[in-house]
Amino acid sequence: MRRSLAPSQRGGQRLSSRNDFTPPLLKKNKRACQQDLEQERLRQSALRDATNTSDLPLPIRFTANTEYEMAIAKVLARKFKVPIDNYVPDYGGNRTLGVRRRIVRRPLHDPLACNALVLYHAPNYTDHERMSMEPSSVLVHVVVDPLLSNILRPHQREGVRFMYECVEGKRGNFNGCIMADEMGLGKTLQCVALVWTLLKQSAECKPTINKCIIVSPSSLVKNWEKEFTKWLHGRMHCLAMEGGSKENTVRALEQFSMNASTRLGTPVLLISYETFRIYAEILCKYEVGMVICDEGHRLKNSDNLTYQALMGLKTKRRVLLSGTPIQNDLTEYFSLVNFVNPEMLGTAADFKRNFENCILRGQNADSTDKERDRALEKTQELIKLVDQCIIRRTNQILTKYLPVKFEMVICAKLTPIQLQLYTNFLKSDQVRRSLADCKEKASLTALADITTLKKLCSHPNLICEKIAAEEKGFENSQNILPINYNPKGEINPELSGKFKLLDFMLAAIRAHGNDKVVLISNYTQTLDLFEQLARKRKYGFVRLDGTMSIKKRSKVVDRFNDPESDCFLFMLSSKAGGCGLNLIGANRLFMFDPDWNPANDEQAMARVWRDGQKKPCYIYRLVASGSIEEKILQRQTHKKSLSSTIIDNNESAEKHFTRDDLKDLFSFDPDILSDTHDKLKCKRCVQNVQMKPPPDDTDCTSHLSQWYHCSNNRGLPDNILAQAWTDSKCVSFVFHHRSQSQKIETTPATETSVEAKPEPERRKRPAMPLSDDSADEDFQGF
């Protein structure tokens, strides 16, 4: 049976005429078409002029054989006439069939949809206005993608709108802003929404920018890439520069910089501050739509190379992110504002003359009333000026979305060995010479002595080399240590009050639940001791410090946050990973030693109480009772409350101590429960026993004088700490408070309720370097 007419099926036979196939449509050339049209015109003309059948063309002659058929044939052959007077056909035009539809401009997303976030409201045009306007001049709404607007919280919607209005110049004659929200409020998500909106739409129905550069610490480059993938569901790819050879890096950056197309495959460049500084020459050649600087407080010094390199970028849209408000130095404040909006405060000399000198004179103890009034006037003027481009919200907003957070400052007593080493060092000739060498500021010797005391407060192992070498201040100290003391062997927690307390608390946490713990220290040597303790107790752990590569850091964090992971401890160096890490797999955090800068400690302690946390959080800050660590804590509190100009650019606060300050640092009372509480001169306590609770409107962001004060383990919000106080016998005093309004039972075994009373959302202007604490009757200064 033949299936087709193909030659292989016909068997070589010729097709019969009845099987010949002629396609219905033949491609004719222009000349053939014109001949057909001419023949048709002649045929119709013959029909009109014919008077009898014999005059008709031959094909019609056989059908029109009667007068009736003749009449019908003439009607069909009648020429069409356009029913318009004096119509002249346009035979030479290029008109197409039908009417060309008018393009109507519409926003990319529906501005009337539920939860729609409209960043720009277009004019409400009438139909007559639309008809009379050029299509290219019609403006449309700018609406955030519903993929993002449906998950943004109220304060985040406000933040996205604020940043959009700033970078688009709708709030004034500037195009930069500072997002100064505290840690955990979703600054990254707000920036993702802003970047995605600017890359996809504008009021003119085209992208506002074609590419964006996001600069961050090296440890956060991968985190930014994950955030874009997470929130945009893979709709956009980023170019993340992390590692790689120099040749590949140069090639990738040149390709990114030179490409000006709006259809760029990777429109967002994620790069670290260090890498940007190295390859700034490539990135500064071409225009960039916008730059975002994460952890922007790194740019507080306008003289460093990174600041100068970023200022060379050819872009007017600049966004700076920083979770720590600039309170300590007006020069830092100027540097940050000048980076995002170079013309707002004038030059550095103008700022110093118009604002800084007046404000600093008003803060002097011997200032006149006129100078103080002038300082207040200038401060208000400066606040009003920079408020246009700075937005700041506190983490009190999170109380509506996160579990309760309990923060505790624990004063741990020094062990007898620590106590003897500490007092011997303070009485030594070394300290006396350090004080004698100080005139206006601390000498290098005094700074080294301060570091020695800080390490001794953590564990004698940290100064074992000084003891073995019998350095100045530690002569004959070898006799104080136990006979079997071996610093290179297994750690002995009993030699340190803080380590002893930590050991008891970790054991209780491990035994009574599945909570995970973050251990933070400023010294990698202390992390080594944490490791020894974890191995001794057989705790699973991971460690992140400055020696870990960027790629490995994200894997370590993901492993720890995995609920199925056996990692119990996360050991973190505050210098290497104190910013930006999300460690929500843990709900307990120990800040083992304080830093001179309160912002560093706050950044580090914000790692667990963040979006995604499901458990109540416990933050423990350990300080050695009466020691130099309490002095550091007092200065932290003093800076936060007074907002005074203490810390200079890129310098530690300890370099600015006067001789009197050093005398206070090197003072020590071994019998005191808490030097901090004594200096508060708390009116709510009688003989270190709290008689009156703190005001109802206070929380853990309030001054320490407004916290709960405990000289015994009654009334503590944490059963673990209450039990460890009894077992370890090394706790002398505790300050504690919670993150939100919540009743705390004052019983020995306190059960905490995680139901929190939501507080109203607060928008707070950035703190300025002038404040007054006279309204706080309990605050007596330090």
UniProtKB/Swiss-Prot annotation:
<dbReference type="InterPro" id="IPR001650">
    <property type="entry name" value="Helicase_C-like"/>
</dbReference>
<dbReference type="Pfam" id="PF00271">
    <property type="entry name" value="Helicase_C"/>
</dbReference>
<feature type="domain" description="Helicase ATP-binding">
    <location>
        <begin position="168"/>
        <end position="343"/>
    </location>
</feature>
<keyword id="KW-0539">Nucleus</keyword>
<dbReference type="GO" id="GO:0015616">
    <property type="term" value="F:DNA translocase activity"/>
</dbReference>
<keyword id="KW-0597">Phosphoprotein</keyword>
<dbReference type="GO" id="GO:0045003">
    <property type="term" value="P:double-strand break repair via synthesis-dependent strand annealing"/>
</dbReference>
<dbReference type="GO" id="GO:0016817">
    <property type="term" value="F:hydrolase activity, acting on acid anhydrides"/>
</dbReference>
<dbReference type="GO" id="GO:0051301">
    <property type="term" value="P:cell division"/>
</dbReference>
<dbReference type="Pfam" id="PF08658">
    <property type="entry name" value="Rad54_N"/>
</dbReference>
<feature type="compositionally biased region" description="Polar residues">
    <location>
        <begin position="741"/>
        <end position="753"/>
    </location>
</feature>
<dbReference type="InterPro" id="IPR000330">
    <property type="entry name" value="SNF2_N"/>
</dbReference>
<keyword id="KW-0547">Nucleotide-binding</keyword>
<feature type="domain" description="Helicase C-terminal">
    <location>
        <begin position="501"/>
        <end position="658"/>
    </location>
</feature>
<dbReference type="GO" id="GO:0005524">
    <property type="term" value="F:ATP binding"/>
</dbReference>
<feature type="compositionally biased region" description="Acidic residues">
    <location>
        <begin position="773"/>
        <end position="782"/>
    </location>
</feature>
<dbReference type="GO" id="GO:0004386">
    <property type="term" value="F:helicase activity"/>
</dbReference>
<protein>
    <recommendedName>
        <fullName>DNA repair and recombination protein RAD54-like</fullName>
        <ecNumber>3.6.4.-</ecNumber>
    </recommendedName>
</protein>
<feature type="region of interest" description="Disordered">
    <location>
        <begin position="741"/>
        <end position="782"/>
    </location>
</feature>
<keyword id="KW-0498">Mitosis</keyword>
<keyword id="KW-0227">DNA damage</keyword>
<dbReference type="InterPro" id="IPR027417">
    <property type="entry name" value="P-loop_NTPase"/>
</dbReference>
<feature type="region of interest" description="Required for chromatin remodeling, strand pairing activities and coupling of ATPase activity">
    <location>
        <begin position="2"/>
        <end position="9"/>
    </location>
</feature>
<keyword id="KW-0469">Meiosis</keyword>
<dbReference type="InterPro" id="IPR038718">
    <property type="entry name" value="SNF2-like_sf"/>
</dbReference>
<dbReference type="GO" id="GO:0000724">
    <property type="term" value="P:double-strand break repair via homologous recombination"/>
</dbReference>
<dbReference type="GO" id="GO:0005634">
    <property type="term" value="C:nucleus"/>
</dbReference>
<feature type="compositionally biased region" description="Polar residues">
    <location>
        <begin position="1"/>
        <end position="20"/>
    </location>
</feature>
<comment type="subunit">
    <text>Interacts (via N-terminus) with spn-A/Rad51.</text>
</comment>
<keyword id="KW-0067">ATP-binding</keyword>
<keyword id="KW-0132">Cell division</keyword>
<dbReference type="Pfam" id="PF00176">
    <property type="entry name" value="SNF2-rel_dom"/>
</dbReference>
<feature type="short sequence motif" description="DEGH box">
    <location>
        <begin position="294"/>
        <end position="297"/>
    </location>
</feature>
<dbReference type="InterPro" id="IPR013967">
    <property type="entry name" value="Rad54_N"/>
</dbReference>
<dbReference type="InterPro" id="IPR049730">
    <property type="entry name" value="SNF2/RAD54-like_C"/>
</dbReference>
<feature type="modified residue" description="Phosphothreonine">
    <location>
        <position position="22"/>
    </location>
</feature>
<dbReference type="GO" id="GO:0003677">
    <property type="term" value="F:DNA binding"/>
</dbReference>
<dbReference type="GO" id="GO:0006338">
    <property type="term" value="P:chromatin remodeling"/>
</dbReference>
<dbReference type="GO" id="GO:0000711">
    <property type="term" value="P:meiotic DNA repair synthesis"/>
</dbReference>
<feature type="region of interest" description="Disordered">
    <location>
        <begin position="1"/>
        <end position="28"/>
    </location>
</feature>
<dbReference type="InterPro" id="IPR014001">
    <property type="entry name" value="Helicase_ATP-bd"/>
</dbReference>
<dbReference type="InterPro" id="IPR050496">
    <property type="entry name" value="SNF2_RAD54_helicase_repair"/>
</dbReference>
